[in-house]
């Protein structure tokens, strides 16, 4: 941060780069080299200085540097970045202030930076026109590339392009140098692209390389150059590359999972898809054809005779496709299988494996690669229903399980993981950008502080002199006046302005006293305010300022925070930077240019000079005469502008008056700029305005009574007008003359009469009721447009036409009236009005051109009116905003996507275009190009777009068939992976991030009400008033209810008092001011008068206040502190606020923040009881019932009442008993199961039918009994207030009704039959019984409101497309077909309907038919759009649309080709946006619900939460007892070998190799290969058996304590058995090879050992964590499928078999229904299942067809039921369940990522315990201190402590128990602490771990630590010190003693003395030696117990002390 401040910013920081500069740099480099000759590279990179990110090449120069002096533009300058101070670089700045950085070394060894040629090259390079030229060239080039057969002259154009690119590269190379230094040509990866493109251009030109088209495709890469030219794109591409890097782990995991699944598929289905139905026995003709002559020699009675025998050739017969069974309209023969549940062959055919695989032979499981492709297709869910149906038909229905696993684990999980990863990458990048921006902001603040200090210092003297002359009006003013005086950035104009002001001030100081106040006021307002260029930001990011007065850097300096925050204030901004509670509006609300820079937030907000203001801001009658104040009134305030104007166009001033500082002028009380509600368009009546204004402030009376003050206040209007004019001018985008023009012509205020008219019009048009009426008109108009259909009667058509005219008239009138009321100038200042104007104009144009052909499209523009609803519909508004936002953010992304699509489209066209033309007969029987080909650019584009939609497999088959497999696979996979996965997911990530909880919750800004709400509100008030009057009238007639009247009266009194006391103290505040609005519009007013006595609500009414909307409660607030200032509006925005306020009242809390008066507490506080399981029944009836019907009240103390009570208690006990509940659940399951038997065959199975009928009765009686018991036990009140009970009740009712009907013999009635189908709802009762499902359902119900809201918005959105579709295609899909072949007649034969009718008259084979799913009316339009949005059945609709010509005309092939675009646009907006919006809403909703539930997962029950938490922290593991090492020597050796890691890894490698050999298997391999593989397999079996045996030997019976071992054992046994009994097992069971695949799961164990696999571990961990929740969702999905299956069986069992319904996939039996429904869960193939159900009358179906074995007649479907069935199922399963899946996975993925990002993960703890086992074999949980050092070294990072580590361990202060042992938790904890560092969290973690440990180890040895390692060390050291001191003391004593003895014995003989002396010296030496050894021992920190005795240390020291003493003596 400091670096940026080093170079003083400002214009004088630029210096030319000269030879001297270069010499200086070289000198600096030399100095540095001399200083440190060997720089340590690594260290330098880490901590060294980094380049400044703001001064990177390519970025724009930060404005802090000011303007570049003109002579320095495009010239070499010294580098500004301090990082490059000793690097040979220089920079060049162009006019646009972009930075270019060059190397200062010689380019190409010859051109120095000062060479004129290089200088010219640099000038060209940095010029903006140069990049423009290149850009245009690239775009033109792209246009030429899209030509499929370019004419000859394009060759020259090619040369031109190549020439321009060569010129560009040469310029770059000359300017930059080629490749050696930094910043040279090849150092930029984007230039590599250029280089290769140019090289290829020359190579292909001069060298003949054969296949040119492949090389020509390289030219396409030029399109990528656009990315390098447009700056914003580079960042997006950066983001893409980032997300791809992040995806690497997911990709590995995906490939791994797919491989495993592919292997399983290979083993299960190898060769199955080649089973065909072959005609058998063969006919005579075929016998002859396939017989071969063979000459054989027969020994006939010993004579050899040559005979010719005809032998049947079986092989050639089965390969001949003529004898295969084909269904009509299918390319491939019908598949079949030999198992009982597989597809069966028709009569006369048998099932044989022959011929090729389906789909040109590309769909199969015959080899690993094809199986992998099939699984990839399954994962991406493209046309997977086809694969599913083929496989089930060939292998059997049981294999549905395989698909369920793949779809749920593979598809949903992996695809969503990709989404999660991309979203997180995006999120991280956003976070980084934000942090960077905040850091910049901080740096900027710092710079400003610095400047400020410098300037203040420079100003000190000047200020001193100035202050003698003039007293400044405000401190703030003085500060800022001086502050920018000496600023480098201060521009000339600003200085002039200051001088002018100074002169003026001096003048005023001298002569101002005599001047009249008002006149001064005028000069102040006119001059000073006018001249200070008001800065003001629009949408927080366009910083505009007055050009005439200030230069850019001057005013930019004054923008305090908003510099780096584009979109800071827009509500929809993805991330808010820093919430400022007080600033509602734009950053610098009214801040003056110079007054806002250096004050802090608070003072800045008061910095506008204006006198105090009058209470009423403007008087309505004055307003019409003074132009300026009117301008103030209607200054538009749309949502985008953070202006000072509230929603009525009135400046709102909030805050009390400030005390005048001097008579000269005073501060305007803080001006808050209210950001008006986006939905408001300034249309509010005068009274509403006044009301709102009055609610904005509260001024004391004495202030207004002072005449001079009032006089001055009157001029406020003019001043504010000036302010507003300033604001206007500050936003000027056009030259002033335009403004002059608009003032004259566009603001109409010529005559007073006109103004009166205008006033009246204003009153009318701006009234909320008018708004309401207009909204109703919009809705009606939409309805009218939606009523168009085909065929329509003339009368109906006329009604619609007239209606359209009327509505057009109404909207036109509205527009003109608004223009009159607002003046054109202001009318068009607002977005909504422009929108209205646009639509009205279009409608008028369309009326004029109504009869012109081809312009009917204009009618579609009328649909945009629907969007006007957004004004008053917040969610729609939000959706549009999110789309707008995303499109803003997506602008660049869309460009990248467009470039990718373009490149691939061109590549496809260049590579495959010719092949499609040449080999077309391979894929089309009539040798015409199919609809999907790549022969021209448009079709190629469509194919790429289709791939992006996720449909790639079918077009890829065609491509592979015509152009070869390898190329097609590569291209399609690239489009798929790059385009689909990455870009679409980035798209999703953007959508998700533009969603944030507050978007949905608080859609209304600032609690503003829009006019619609006001109008509705008024109506509510009116109704409430009428109600109350009637109520009072009734009450007067019934005195019985006098009590209620008494309640209401004081309330009314309070209201009246409120008004009177209020108006006494404030300047005109609206009378009908409401604070708390009830839902029903009744208000709880808030009284203000200290005289008002508390109104105490008694308890019952206290509750009824909440429940009874017509009871108003007044809550007094003391006058002085009412919260008026803070309330801008009188209404709460949404019911949620209301709920909150209700809750507040409910809690009897104070009603106003500062209020001294509370709501009276209820007389008795109701104790809130937790609803525990009470053992007594509750009351039978509600209190209301008991009051009305006295008979309901029973005395339960005596007589019959008591018996009744006892009965109830008995029932209660029964119902509450666990067994009762279990029994009922069992019954529910049984009865649901019984429903599954009622299929198509029920009539044939008489016994089952009879049983079911009886069972049904029994179940019904049981359920009725249960219901009665519950009624008696719980009482009606409890029973009927529980939603689950209601569900039970209704379902029992259905059974009861159908039972009764059966008994009475009405069972065949239609109504009863349909009622019987409702029995399918029975399983729903299971919901409330299973907690897992109930949890999910509750979560879903919580999400329903917002899901419905979005659903509605999507419906509106789709409505537009649907109506447009009706306009474009209604009646045009009819076509004439030949009923025998089913083909369409050619347009030559049949041109229109009449031709077709003629054909029908002549012969019967023709038919004029419509496509089943069409656009004939809006309803069908919706259905068609749903098919397009789910990409199922959309082809037929698109083909019909593309072929359509006109109503009643026969369609023609690709007649209106560009109708494809309608679908493309719909897919982008209708499908991508809206469907992804669902995902957004659901995820968002669940996050909100999680917050509500305290952050717990809402899909899990308590039990599962426990499992989840256990998974989350395995810290709860206890040290396990390891398997003891066997005593036997041989066994011991084997044990050591088996338990080594190497052994595990080698086994792992063997498993992988085994997999590889399995992958090599193919279906048609030779005998030789088969034998080799079986031998290899044998080897593996031997090896695995060996492993098994070894482990058994070494581990003994412990072998079976480990799950994996048991699994291995089983696999080995099966393999051995399988070798001998292979045929037998395969016949009855699954092939045993399958189990080997499952062994791959063992890889999971190895992942822990691989360091690099951390990411994959995280992903698997996320999956493990998601499992419980996913299981619940799966359960719910199963329940939904079950119910729908039963329903489908009862409704669609007999429909005609066609399209998607056939002998295997139908609704005839329960199993088949489930198979179909599972397929539709991913919305696959639902169009095929729906099509037969749409047949409702002949000739499509036969209503009288007899179904054998059943009484039901006909095979027609019921279209309405069918559509409802499928659409509801798709919405429930696809949108809800699948998206819940996504939500769970995203959630857990982020949790898992956070976990893995933590320094310590589960694995580390696990590893700790694994190592622990080796050191503590008996699992005592303790370890001796001396082992600790080795243990710490044996751990793996991050926990390990490499040796030597003794001192560190001692310093850890570990608690020890007797025997010098330390507990494992203490060690783990200390190590953890070392990794994480000290923090408050550590203590929490410690407690948590201990609790967990205690819980998981009840056997935990309770221990009391005696000491700690540190204490022990301290004790040792102290002991040593004591010893030393004592020895020293001893020595002294000895010496003393010796000398004494010596002196004493001096007299005695000398020999004796010598002996003594020796003794003393010995004694001294001895002492010092022990001291030395002691020292070494302690410093080496040997294990403290020297004698290795585990005695407590104290004893030991005592003992040692005694020894010493003994020695001493």
Curated annotation (Swiss-Prot):
The gene is SCN1A. Changing residue 1326 to D: Found in a patient with an unclassified form of epilepsy; likely pathogenic. The Nav1.1 voltage-gated sodium channel consists of an ion-conducting alpha subunit SCN1A which is functional on its own regulated by one or more beta-1 (SCN1B), beta-2 (SCN2B), beta-3 (SCN3B) and beta-4 (SCN4B) subunits. SCN1B and SCN3B are non-covalently associated with SCN1A. SCN2B and SCN4B are disulfide-linked to SCN1A. SCN1B regulates both the expression at the plasma membrane and the voltage dependence of Nav1.1 inactivation. SCN3B and SCN4B reduce Nav1.1 conductance. Probably interacts with TMEM233; modulates the gating properties of NaV1.1. Disulfide bonds join 277-345, 336-351, 921-927, 959-968, 1376-1396, 1741-1756. Residues 1619-1636 are annotated as: S3b-S4 loop of repeat IV. This is Sodium channel protein type 1 subunit alpha. The chain crosses the membrane at residues 129-146, 153-177, 189-205, 214-235, 246-269, 398-423, 769-787, 798-820, 831-849, 855-874, 892-912, 966-992, 1219-1237, 1251-1276, 1279-1304, 1314-1332, 1346-1369, 1458-1483, 1542-1560, 1572-1593, 1602-1623, 1637-1655, 1666-1688, 1760-1788. Residues 1-128, 178-188, 236-245, 424-768, 821-830, 875-891, 993-1218, 1277-1278, 1333-1345, 1484-1541, 1594-1601, 1656-1665, 1789-2009 are cytoplasmic. III repeats lie at residues 1200-1514. Residues 1561-1571 are annotated as: S1-S2 loop of repeat IV. Changing residue 1393 to P: In DRVT; borderline phenotype. It comes from Homo sapiens.
């Amino acid at each position: 941060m400091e670096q940026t401040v080093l170079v003083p910013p400002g214009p004088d920081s630029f210096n030319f780069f000269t030879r001297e500069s270069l010499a200086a740099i070289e000198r600096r480099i030399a100095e540095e080299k001399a200083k440190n000759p060997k720089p340590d590279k690594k260290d330098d990179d880490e901590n060294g200085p980094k380049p400044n990110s703001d001064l990177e090449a390519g970025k724009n120069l930060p404005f802090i540097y000011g303007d570049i002096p003109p002579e320095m533009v495009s010239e070499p300058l010294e580098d500004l970045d301090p990082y490059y101070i000793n690097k040979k670089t220089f920079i060049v700045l162009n006019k646009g202030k972009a930075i270019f950085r060059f190397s200062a070394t010689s380019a190409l060894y010859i051109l120095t930076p000062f060479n004129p040629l290089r200088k010219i090259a640099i000038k060209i390079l940095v010029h903006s026109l140069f990049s423009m030229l290149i850009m245009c060239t690239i775009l033109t080039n792209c246009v030429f590339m899209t030509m499929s057969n370019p004419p000859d002259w394009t060759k020259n154009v090619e040369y031109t392009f190549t020439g321009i690119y060569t010129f560009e590269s040469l310029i770059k190379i000359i300017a930059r140098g080629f490749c050696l230094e930094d910043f040279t040509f090849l150092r930029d990866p984007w230039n590599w692209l250029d280089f290769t493109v140019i090289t290829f251009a020359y190579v292909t030109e001069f060298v003949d390389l054969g296949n040119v088209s492949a090389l020509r495709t390289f030219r396409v890469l030029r399109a990528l150059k656009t990315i390098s030219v447009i700056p914003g794109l580079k960042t997006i591409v950066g983001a893409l590359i980032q997300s791809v890097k992040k995806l690497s782990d997911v990709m590995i995991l995906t490939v791994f999972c797919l491989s495993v699944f592919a292997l399983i598929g290979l083993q299960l289905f190898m060769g199955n898809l080649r089973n065909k139905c072959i005609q058998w026995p063969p006919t005579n003709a075929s016998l002859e054809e396939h017989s071969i002559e063979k000459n054989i020699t027969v020994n006939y009675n010993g004579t050899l005779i040559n005979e010719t025998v005809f032998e049947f050739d079986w092989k050639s017969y089965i390969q001949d496709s003529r004898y295969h069974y084909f269904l009509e309209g299918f390319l491939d023969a019908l598949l079949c299988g030999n198992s009982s549940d597989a597809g069966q062959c028709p009569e006369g055919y048998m099932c044989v494996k022959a011929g090729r695989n389906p789909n040109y032979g590309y769909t199969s499981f015959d080899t690993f690669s094809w199986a992998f492709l099939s699984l990839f297709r399954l994962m991406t869910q493209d046309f997977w229903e086809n694969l599913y149906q083929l496989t089930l038909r060939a292998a059997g229905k049981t294999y549905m399980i395989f698909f369920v696993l793949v779809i749920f684990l593979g598809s949903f999980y992996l695809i969503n993981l990709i989404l999660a990863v991309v979203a997180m990458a995006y999120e991280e990048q956003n976070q980084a950008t934000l942090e960077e921006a905040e850091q910049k902001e901080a740096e900027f603040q710092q710079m400003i502080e610095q400047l400020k200090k410098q300037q203040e210092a420079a100003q000190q003297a000047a200020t001193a002199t100035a202050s003698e002359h003039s007293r400044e009006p405000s401190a703030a003013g003085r500060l800022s006046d001086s502050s920018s005086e000496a600023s480098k950035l201060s521009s000339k104009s600003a200085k002039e302005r200051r001088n002018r002001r100074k002169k003026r001030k001096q003048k005023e100081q001298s002569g101002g006293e005599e001047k009249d106040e008002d006149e001064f006021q005028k000069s102040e307002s006119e001059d000073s305010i006018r001249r200070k260029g008001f800065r003001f930001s629009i949408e927080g990011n366009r910083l505009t300022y007055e050009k005439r007065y200030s230069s850019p850097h001057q005013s930019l300096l004054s923008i305090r925070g908003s510099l780096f925050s584009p979109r800071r204030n827009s509500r929809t901004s993805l991330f808010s930077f820093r919430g400022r509670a007080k600033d509602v509006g734009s950053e610098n609300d009214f801040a003056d240019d110079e007054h806002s820079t250096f004050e802090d937030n608070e003072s800045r907000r008061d910095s506008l000079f204006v006198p105090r203001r009058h209470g009423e801001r403007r008087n309505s009658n004055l307003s019409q005469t003074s132009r300026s104040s009117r301008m103030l009134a209607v200054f538009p305030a749309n949502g985008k502008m953070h202006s000072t104007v509230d929603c009525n166009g009135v400046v709102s001033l909030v805050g009390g008056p400030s005390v005048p500082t001097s008579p000269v002028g005073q501060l305007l009380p803080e001006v808050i700029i209210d950001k008006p509600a986006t939905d408001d368009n300034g249309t509010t009546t005068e009274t509403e305005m006044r009301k709102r204004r009055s609610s904005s402030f509260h001024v004391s009376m004495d202030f207004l009574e002072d005449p001079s003050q009032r006089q001055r206040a009157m001029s406020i209007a003019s001043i504010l007008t000036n302010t507003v004019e300033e604001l206007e001018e500050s936003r000027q985008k056009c030259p002033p003359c335009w403004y002059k023009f608009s003032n004259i012509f566009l603001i109409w205020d010529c005559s007073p009469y006109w103004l009166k008219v205008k006033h009246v019009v204003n009153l009318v048009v701006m009234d909320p009721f008018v708004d309401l009426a207009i909204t109703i008109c919009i809705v009606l108009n939409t309805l009218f447009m939606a009523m168009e259909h085909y065929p329509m009667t003339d009368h109906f058509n006329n009604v619609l036409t007239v209606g359209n005219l009327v509505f057009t008239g109404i909207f036109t009138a509205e527009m003109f009236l608004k223009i009159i009321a607002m003046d054109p100038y202001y009318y068009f200042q607002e977005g909504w009005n422009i929108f209205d104007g646009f639509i009205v104009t279009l409608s008028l144009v369309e009326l004029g051109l109504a009869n012109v052909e081809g312009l009917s499209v204009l009618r579609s523009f009328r649909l945009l009116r629907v969007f006007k609803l957004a004004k008053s519909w917040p969610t729609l508004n939000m959706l549009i905003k999110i789309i707008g936002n995303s499109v803003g953010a997506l602008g660049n992304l869309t460009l990248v996507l467009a470039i990718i699509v373009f490149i691939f489209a061109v590549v496809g066209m260049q590579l495959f275009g010719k092949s499609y033309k040449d080999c077309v007969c391979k894929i089309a029987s009539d040798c015409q190009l199919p609809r999907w080909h790549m022969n021209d650019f448009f079709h190629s584009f469509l194919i790429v777009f289709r791939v992006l939609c996720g449909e790639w497999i079918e077009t890829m088959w065609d491509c592979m068939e015509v152009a070869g497999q390898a190329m097609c696979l590569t291209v399609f996979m690239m489009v798929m992976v790059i385009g689909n996965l990455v870009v679409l997911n980035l798209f999703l990530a953007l959508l998700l991030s533009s969603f944030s909880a507050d978007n949905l919750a608080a859609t209304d800004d600032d609690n503003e009400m829009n006019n619609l709400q006001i109008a509705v509100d008024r109506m509510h008030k009116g109704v409430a008033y009428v109600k109350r009057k009637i109520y009072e009238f009734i009450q007067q007639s019934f005195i019985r209810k006098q009590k209620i009247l008494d309640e209401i009266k004081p309330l009314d009194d309070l209201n009246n008092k409120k008004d009177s006391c209020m108006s006494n103290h404030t300047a005109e505040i609206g009378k009908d001011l409401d604070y708390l609005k009830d839902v029903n519009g009744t208000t709880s007013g808030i009284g203000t008068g200290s005289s008002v006595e508390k109104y105490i609500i008694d308890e019952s009414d206290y509750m009824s206040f909440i429940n009874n909307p017509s009871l108003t409660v007044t809550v007094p607030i003391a006058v002085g502190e009412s919260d008026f200032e803070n309330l801008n509006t009188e209404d709460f925005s949404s019911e949620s606020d209301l709920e909150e306020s209700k809750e507040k009242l409910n809690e009897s809390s104070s009603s106003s923040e500062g209020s001294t008066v509370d709501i009276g507490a209820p007389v008795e506080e109701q104790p809130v009881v937790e609803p525990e399981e009470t053992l007594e029944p509750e009351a039978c009836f509600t209190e209301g019932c008991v009051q009305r019907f006295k008979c309901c009240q029973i005395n339960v103390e005596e007589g019959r009442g008591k018996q009744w009570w006892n009965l109830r208690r008995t029932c209660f006990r029964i119902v509450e008993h666990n067994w009762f509940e279990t029994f009922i659940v069992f019954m529910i399951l049984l009865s649901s199961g019984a429903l599954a038997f009622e299929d198509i065959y029920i009539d044939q199975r008489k016994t089952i039918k009879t049983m079911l009928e009886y069972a049904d009765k029994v179940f019904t009686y049981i359920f009725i009994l249960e219901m009665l018991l519950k009624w008696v036990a719980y009482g009606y009140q409890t029973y009927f207030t529980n939603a689950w009970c209601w569900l039970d009740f209704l379902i029992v009712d259905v059974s009861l009704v159908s039972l009764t009907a059966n008994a009475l013999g009405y069972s065949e009635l239609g109504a009863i039959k349909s009622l019987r189908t409702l029995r399918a709802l029975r399983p729903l009762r299971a919901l409330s019984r299973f907690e897992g499902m109930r949890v999910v359902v509750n979560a879903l119900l919580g999400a329903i409101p917002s899901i419905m809201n979005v659903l509605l918005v999507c419906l509106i959105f789709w409505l537009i497309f649907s109506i447009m579709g009706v306009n474009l295609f209604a009646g045009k899909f009819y076509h004439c077909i030949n009923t025998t072949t089913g083909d369409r007649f050619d347009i030559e034969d049949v041109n229109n309907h009449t031709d077709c009718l003629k054909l029908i008259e002549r012969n019967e084979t023709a038919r004029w038919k419509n496509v089943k799913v069409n656009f004939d009316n809006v309803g069908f339009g919706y259905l068609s759009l749903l098919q397009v949005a789910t990409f199922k059945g959309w082809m037929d609709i698109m083909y019909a649309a593309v072929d359509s010509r006109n109503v009643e005309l026969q369609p023609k092939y690709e007649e209106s080709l560009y109708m494809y675009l309608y679908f493309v646009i719909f897919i982008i907006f209708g499908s991508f946006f809206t469907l992804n919006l669902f995902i957004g809403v659901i995820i968002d909703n669940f996050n909100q619900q999680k917050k509500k539930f305290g952050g717990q997962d809402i899909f899990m029950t308590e039990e599962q939460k426990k499992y989840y938490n256990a998974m989350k922290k395995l810290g709860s593991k206890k040290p396990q007892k390891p398997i003891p090492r066997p005593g036997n020597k041989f066994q011991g050796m084997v044990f050591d070998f088996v338990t080594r890691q190497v052994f595990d890894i080698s086994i792992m490698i063997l498993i992988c190799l085994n997999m590889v050999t399995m992958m090599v298997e193919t279906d048609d391999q030779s005998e030789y290969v088969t034998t080799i593989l079986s031998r290899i397999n044998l080897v593996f079996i031997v090896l695995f058996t060996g492993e098994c045996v070894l482990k058994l030997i070494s581990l003994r019976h412990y072998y079976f304590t480990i799950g994996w071992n048991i699994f291995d054992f089983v696999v080995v046994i099966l393999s051995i058995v399988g070798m001998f009994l292979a045929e037998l097992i395969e016949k009855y069971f699954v092939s045993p090879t399958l189990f080997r695949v499952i062994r791959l799961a063992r890889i999971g164990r190895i992942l822990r050992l691989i360091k690099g696999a951390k990411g994959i571990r995280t992903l698997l961990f996320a999956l493990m964590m998601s499992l419980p929740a996913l299981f619940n969702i799966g359960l719910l999905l199963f329940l939904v499928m079950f119910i729908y299956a039963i329903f489908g069986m009862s409704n669609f069992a007999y429909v005609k078999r066609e399209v998607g319904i056939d002998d295997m996939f139908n609704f005839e039996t329960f199993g088949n229904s489930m198979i179909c429904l599972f397929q539709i869960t991913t919305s696959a193939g639902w169009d095929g299942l729906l099509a037969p159900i749409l047949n409702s009358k002949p000739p499509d179906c036969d209503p009288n067809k007899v179904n054998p074995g059943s009484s039901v007649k006909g095979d027609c479907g019921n279209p309405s039921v069918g559509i409802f069935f499928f659409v509801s199922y798709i919405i429930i399963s696809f949108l809800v369940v699948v998206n819940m899946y996504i939500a769970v996975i995203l959630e857990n993925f982020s949790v898992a990522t956070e976990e893995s990002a933590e320094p310590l993960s589960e694995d580390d703890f696990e590893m700790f315990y694994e190592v622990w086992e080796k050191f503590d074999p008996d699992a005592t949980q303790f370890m001796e201190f001396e082992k600790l050092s080795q243990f710490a070294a044996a751990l793996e990072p991050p926990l390990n402590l490499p040796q030597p580590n003794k001192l560190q361990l001692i310093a850890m202060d570990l608690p020890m128990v007797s025997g010098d042992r330390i507990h494992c938790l203490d060690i783990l904890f200390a190590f953890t602490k070392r990794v994480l560092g000290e923090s408050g969290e550590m203590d929490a973690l410690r407690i948590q771990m201990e609790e967990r440990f205690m819980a998981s180890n009840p056997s935990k040895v309770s221990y009391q630590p005696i000491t700690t390692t540190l204490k022990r060390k301290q004790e040792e050291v102290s002991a040593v010190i004591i010893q030393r001191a004592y020895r020293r003391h001893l020595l002294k004593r000895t010496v003393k003693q010796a000398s004494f003895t010596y002196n004493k014995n001096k007299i005695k003989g000398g020999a004796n003395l010598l002996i003594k002396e020796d003794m003393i010296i010995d004694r001294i030496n001895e002492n010092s030696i022990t001291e030395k050894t002691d020292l070494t021992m302690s410093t080496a920190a040997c294990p403290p117990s020297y004698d290795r005795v585990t005695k407590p240390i104290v004893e030991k020291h005592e003992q040692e002390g005694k020894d010493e003493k003994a020695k001493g003596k």
